[in-house]
Amino acid sequence: MTEAAADPVSATWAALAALPRPTLAELFAQDGRVGQLAETLELPGGTIRFDWSKTHLDPAHLAAFERLAEATGFAQRRRALVAGEKVNVTEGRAAEHLAQRGIGAEASVEEAGSFHARMHMLVEAIHGGALGDVRHLIHIGIGGSALGPALALDALARDNPLVDVHVVANIDGCALEAAFEACDPQTTMIAVASKTFTTIETMTNAASALAWLEENGVTDPYGRVVALTAAPDKAVDWGVDETRILPFREAVGGRYSLWSSIGFPVALAIGWDEFAELLEGAAAMDRHFVETDGAANLPLRAAFADQLYTRLRGCQTRAVFAYDERLRLLPSYLQQLEMESNGKSVTADGLPVSGPTAPITWGGVGTDAQHAVFQLLHQGTVIAPVDFIAAIQPGDGLDPAHHRILLANCFAQGAALMAGKAADDPARSYPGDRPSATILVEELNAATLGALIAFHEHRTFANAVLMGINPFDQFGVELGKQIAGEIDRGGVRFDASTEALLEAAGIGG
């Protein structure tokens, strides 16, 4: 017996690699193609249609990938995630983001509910004027503490927010200064979002924001600060009033934390009822993910397509194009979610991985991106599977022609990538057979946005299970931060190139 035959995971990968590779044209010559690969979910806030018919998935691949999911213990890993077991094995923690949406271990769900109640009270107090005239919030965080809130705010709070929110992540002072210029210090609160309350970028920006309040005559600057953290004691030590601290559990990872107290700026801008709809939309997707098996489980099916292209066809990138201006930040959000989770080279057991892991996630907003990167997608030598995401209902009140043209372009790009077009002039020839999937939201609102984000969280988890890795740690970000601290403190010598850069910038020593 060969080693691959003895190992069901390796054997299944080998069987997948041996499957025929029909073209998309050949697949579409078969009856029922769209019915096999497209499905519409009924969700709070409207439907979402998921269509993988323009990918190279076929019944044989779906069946083989289902066997892979069984061999890798997908059902068991999913059960452990929901039960609050320590699925983050390297750090010995659970991953409790589902509990924030009411799914999971009873104790975790109850605690999340109590934290939400505390946040709800503070949001209502601010809206009711109990904390004075609050018109602006500067939300300071980085990574998941900023990307999730920024995405939700850009999608849901564009028109007449209850409080004007500015998200600041970068340590570059230009970012914070721009927020200062847009806000009146007398009517501004500061939210400091840091899981550990030690993140250097966040705490440096927070100190500068506090100084800005003081310099502009705010008599009680600490009274204007809200801390969103899993380390409330550190927030108290920093000077935040205990009544202004909104805690969350350490087992809620940063890139999965929008649903926790990190969502405070979103709730403040759109109101608690709409924030609750965001949670319920995510919970509806959770229920689908938890209760559905095999390829009918849509996040798992998305992972099957991801693995088909990354592992079996050597695609090193995956592109995401949102044909909706309100989702322009989604590609950046997914970059962190997918690459920080699954950009690993060892398994959850600490062994070298046997194949490629997360591809590079990139993208943009349509139709802008068509005039920038689609040349490469259609005629370049790099094959990048594409996800197109659009909403059926427009988000504007302008002439319907705007939205009709937008959707026409979205659907046309997928059709063109698949079909291609022959020409006598090679420079005008399109090879076609290039894959894409389409996610079509009936209406973009808080509930469907919550479902869309949760879908990608579960897709990321499913990919991790199929690859045998832990998606809940991120040790790869630590070394650069460590060296940056050494540079800032001085007294450490580095390689010749780095020393020359330090000298040129005048920060060596």
Residue spans for each PLM region:
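Glycine-rich phosphate-binding loops that contact phosphosugars or nucleotide phosphates
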Residues: 121-292, 486
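Short, solvent-exposed amphipathic alpha-helical segments in soluble enzyme
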Residues: 152-157, 181-185, 206-209, 243, ...
